Amino acid sequence: MRHHRGATHAPGTEEKMIPRTAALLALLALTGCAATGPVTPETVTLPQVSHFSAQNPGERLPTGWQPWTLSRFKRPTEYRLVDYQGRTVVRARARGSASGLVHPLTLEPERYPYLQWQWKVEQLIAKADNTQKHLEDSPVRLVVSFGGDIDRLPLADRMFFDNVRLLTGQQLPYATLMYIWENRAPLDTVIANRHTSRIKMIVAESGRDRLGRWQEVTRNVLEDYRRAFGEEPGPIIAVGIMTDTDNTGDNVHAWYGDIEFRRNRPAAPALASQN
């Protein structure tokens, strides 16, 4: 694993048959908007993120993790606990698909500003470009959702939130950060979502240089939120992972290791590099 790096559709047949629904689903194809599961702090009690490595390969997901479905019209990505050189990790396989795993929690980013995780990507998605909504795919995403007062948001955002709630029965988080692996955009680039100002993507890795090796990434979520949204964050209410290729229709494999929030910046990883 590498030392952490800090800050410095094709439309389906069903959609063609119901164009109004297809148009609305296009708005929901925001790499995670349609259904994130429980996202209000009152409904969760888990103080931290359950480790994948605590389970045995082939077992069910650790307590707290749950499927994250974007739309019944989208093929889900396959997630499994597998052994990787003696360690249990999550393997993701996407085949023109999009779905994720989400873990609700309640955490104050001021107390736990550092987010650390591991991921591994074998190949990039050739046509992916997260600055273009019709090519918005990533082999790996680490997603952090924040609570807040939705009534404070601009009218356009509130209307978008209302539309999502009417269609899915789910309330969008007040704000969402997505850490992605981009093809070309420079490290630390902030990419705004095309439909709402409350979802921002941050390029945590870019290009081909580190493909095929485990990467350990550390981000200061507090600083990233301030930079992306220009305000102080509310509580962290969920963390998730997602591998998606629904817009490009490509096939991709990726792996995710444990995810942790920390009070202090972690030291260098014990394993500097691992294939």
Which ranges hold each PLM region?
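Secreted extracellular polysaccharide-interacting domains
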Residues: 91-111, 124-127, 196-204
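Extracellular-facing segments of soluble proteins and assemblies that are Gly/Ser/Thr-biased and enriched
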Residues: 111-165
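Short carbohydrate-recognition loop motifs
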Residues: 77-99
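Extracellular carbohydrate-recognition regions
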Residues: 36-70, 155-160, 273
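Extracellular beta-strand ligand-recognition surfaces/modules
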Residues: 140-142, 197-207, 211-249
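Extracellular/luminal beta-rich ligand-recognition
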Residues: 137, 148-195
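C-terminal motif of bacterial Sec signal peptides marking the signal peptidase cleavage site
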Residues: 31-32
